């Protein structure tokens, strides 16, 4: 039986590829997709969800837009990474359908309420929508199987020296998620920086030759440009967000540890940092499954295999 998931995202090149992977996988039943502000402004990330679902011929999936800003802060976007549209590079179709006339939280709550079994939430942007859901619907916590997020790291950052972008945008929301009592699975930079797609991998995807694999290759062509800066030390481009979906499909590709994680919301130098109690120094019980390594070739092979679904 397919695993029911709610997908909250802020497309974003890697979010878009995560959507492609999820919808090519019969093991997953995507009940709804909600958008968050983050990689671009909320109007653009919502539009990008609709554009991707139009491309994939999945206009049957319910879509709703989410919070327009973080819980307590002004919005920060990553237009320097993802371009003016949020999905610069390929020629994507215009949306062929409209989002529902409700909020992301209302749609998520409806899906949870109506599901006969607990639902996995996958969140690949700032945690604003998920935190709002948890705060406004405590009666639905038992209907959430786990929350799989892309965010954070153990001791490094990609937006500040200490903080990963998604957590930095809304650290208060991330702290609500980690301390909710619901199991969190964290795909942080420690693993996503190892999930790099190399140029030859992109050509492998392009050679599959269907319209979706071609779009994915073109998304990666654009994504490479930001990540070729030698400060990163990358061979290719890290595919952060698809790690969440890949873990659900093939957890054996990942090495994980069980640890307590908190989020720094006030630090002068460490605001937005995920504090991972790696050596069990805090006395707190683990609240997260933290990914620390990935079989890169297995990850690439999974993407290539699933891209053939769209032939």
From Swiss-Prot:
This is Pyrimidine-specific ribonucleoside hydrolase RihA. It holds the Pfam family IU_nuc_hydro. One of its GO terms (molecular function) is purine nucleosidase activity. One of its GO terms (biological process) is nucleobase-containing small molecule interconversion. Belongs to the IUNH family. RihA subfamily. The active site is at 240. Hydrolyzes cytidine or uridine to ribose and cytosine or uracil, respectively. Coiled coil: none annotated. It comes from Salmonella newport (strain SL254). NCBIfam families: PRK10443.1 (NF007761). GO terms for cellular component: cytosol. It is an enzyme of class 3 (hydrolase). It comes from the Bacteria. The keyword Cell cycle does not apply. Gene3D superfamilies: Ribonucleoside hydrolase-like (3.90.245.10). Keywords: Glycosidase, Hydrolase. The keyword Hydrolase applies. Its EC number is 3.2.-.-.
